[in-house]
From Swiss-Prot:
Lineage: Bacteria, Pseudomonadati, Pseudomonadota, Betaproteobacteria, Burkholderiales
Protein name: Chaperone SurA
Catalytic reaction equation(s): [protein]-peptidylproline (omega=180) = [protein]-peptidylproline (omega=0)
Any one of the GO BP annotations: Gram-negative-bacterium-type cell outer membrane assembly
Listed EC numbers: 5.2.1.8
Keyword Isomerase listed: yes
GO cellular component, one term: outer membrane-bounded periplasmic space
SUPFAM superfamilies: FKBP-like (SSF54534), Triger factor/SurA peptide-binding domain-like (SSF109998)
Location within or outside the cell: Periplasm
Origin species: Bordetella parapertussis (strain 12822 / ATCC BAA-587 / NCTC 13253)
Keyword Chaperone carried by entry: yes
Length: 519
């Protein structure tokens, strides 16, 4: 449970922040009327594919159909978003090709979400909204007014937020759960940091937030932060040597253009196979040690604005650009495998703590707690789960049974064999609804049923203490950096596997090849 709770807490501090560009989630922010395309030396638009296809089908993804109308509408939104970012919009055919690739991957992910039965109800969306508003020190009503002022309806925003939470939970299950960082790896990482004092600052994270934190002051020093963008030329699984050579040649051509001074974001938007292509290739910011080793070796010593050489990975050929770098202490969006908004559109809603931290002891109030979790499903509704926990609570308060026995019998959490014991919990270790309910309890008190993204809980506080967690925080930060280092390639591997196992009939791509052969 603790690993899952921490995973969602990390999601709330990163992905939810990344969804907000100028106060909007990325997908919602794109749901605005498209502005006229900029004039200039842009190539004349080729005939729209809708003129060439009678059936109106752009692609078939397993059993789902993506229509040409969907592609056209998504292309208008993508065009408006690129213009807002100051990125040159590709010609219509290229833009639709890129948009269709994104729609295909989104459809594959949505199919996986449905297959795994991942659901997000209204209460969980409300919790996410309250969390975002709280961390940005505004009320949910003020946040709603800000969003609606931008032209996005509240219903659109909620739907976008729900979709993004579902997708993030999919990534947690499919990718995050398979990344295991051992204690030995953490020990080795910390020893390496000791030999490199400058980099060691990356593991000095701020203390977990206590209730009612004071506003942060900008830090003056901290770990090296690196903001990267990429162009990815994907090499499909099972490609022949000739195909790999052709793709390498394509990547080398793009590299030459980037080195010559062509706009990197425009090149990425028109040519990259990466999931962040239509954001100009932006992957966000991380401490240097948080990027994959391949990326650090290729771009770690480059200055802002410089472009790396060709980087080959298991997924293809990468071209990296250092968008910005800093000695630390400057607010930066935390990068994840999911696409991130470009930096020229800073979010008005900032989330997550600074990487840098003050030196010295880090004292927090720890809570020793235990819980019983009942998950909801198609056979266990919210009402049924809550009623069962209320019955268990009545028996516990009557003294007829022991908490640990009820946890072993009924809890669906991994802590059930230990009687639901969570051990000593630091502030911020659990999701906000769980933590708020836990903090309101006196020692030995049992909460009413509490709803979290994982299900319904009964929580009992056993005791509290003041504790110096400096070493624990440093180890936790080291583990997080090691995790982030693996997350990007792991996510790309998962996307490639998802694609290779699917039936995809890309009719726009077929039409383009047919036209090329007839020339």
């Amino acid at each position: 449970m603790m690993r899952s709770l921490h995973s969602l807490r990390r999601m709330s501090g990163t992905v939810l922040a990344l969804m907000l560009a100028a106060g909007l989630p990325l997908s919602a922010a794109q749901a605005q009327p498209a502005k006229p395309a900029p004039k200039g030396d842009q190539k004349p638009a080729t005939p729209a594919p809708s003129e060439q296809f009678v059936d109106g089908i752009a692609a078939i993804v397993n059993k789902d159909v993506i229509t040409l109308r969907e592609v056209r509408e998504a292309s208008k939104l993508a065009s408006a978003d690129l213009q807002k970012r100051g990125i040159q919009v590709p010609d219509e055919r290229t833009l639709q090709k890129q948009v269709l690739q994104r729609l295909i991957m989104e459809r594959l992910e949505r199919q996986e979400v449905d297959r795994m039965g991942i659901r997000v109800d209204e209460a969980q969306v409300d919790q996410a909204i309250n969390m975002i508003a709280s961390r940005n020190k505004i009320t949910p009503a003020a946040m709603r007014a800000e969003i609606e002022k931008s032209g996005v309806t509240w219903e659109q925003y909620r739907k976008s937020l729900r979709d993004d939470i579902r997708m993030d939970r999919l990534r947690q299950r499919a990718v995050d759960a398979n990344i295991i960082i051992s204690d030995a790896e953490v020990d080795a990482f910390l020893k390496d940091q000791e030999r490199n004092p400058a980099a060691a600052q990356a593991t000095r994270a701020p203390a977990p937030q206590q209730p009612q934190p004071q506003p942060r002051q900008p830090a003056q020093s901290g770990p090296a932060m690196l903001v990267l963008a990429q162009i990815l030329v994907r090499v499909p699984e099972g490609s022949s040597p000739d195909q790999v050579a052709a793709l390498r040649k394509k990547a080398e051509g793009l590299l030459a253009r980037a080195k010559k001074g062509d706009d990197f974001a425009s090149l990425a938007a028109a040519n990259s196979d990466g999931p962040e292509a239509l954001q100009g290739g932006m992957m966000g910011a991380r401490p240097l040690d948080g990027w994959p080793d391949l990326f650090v070796k290729a771009a770690g010593s480059l200055s802002a604005g410089q472009v790396s050489g060709l980087v080959q990975s298991g997924n293809g050929f990468h071209i990296l650009k250092v968008v910005d770098r800093a000695g630390g202490g400057q607010p930066a969006q935390a990068a994840r495998p999911a696409p991130a908004p470009a930096p020229q559109q800073p979010s008005s809603f900032q989330e997550g703590p600074s990487v840098a931290a003050p030196q010295g002891p880090v004292r927090v109030t720890q809570t020793h707690a235990r819980h019983i979790l009942i998950k909801t499903s198609t056979v266990m509704t919210d009402d049924q789960a809550r009623q069962r926990l209320e019955q268990i609570r009545e028996r516990l308060q009557g003294g007829a049974v022991k908490f640990e026995d009820m946890a072993r019998q009924y809890s669906q959490d991994s802590t059930a064999p230990q009687g639901g014991d969570l051990g000593w919990v630091n502030p911020g270790d659990t999701v906000p609804p769980f933590e708020a309910a836990m903090n309101a309890l006196q020692p030995n008190e049992i909460s009413p049923p509490v709803l979290s993204p994982f299900g319904w809980h009964l929580i009992q506080v056993l005791e509290r203490r003041e504790h110096d967690v400096s070493d624990e925080v440093q180890r936790m930060r080291a583990r997080q950096l090691l995790f982030e280092r693996r997350a990007v390639p792991a996510f790309e591997d998962w996307l490639e596997q998802l694609r290779s196992q699917a039936f995809i009939d890309n009719r726009l791509e077929k039409q383009e090849r047919l036209e090329q052969n007839n020339r």
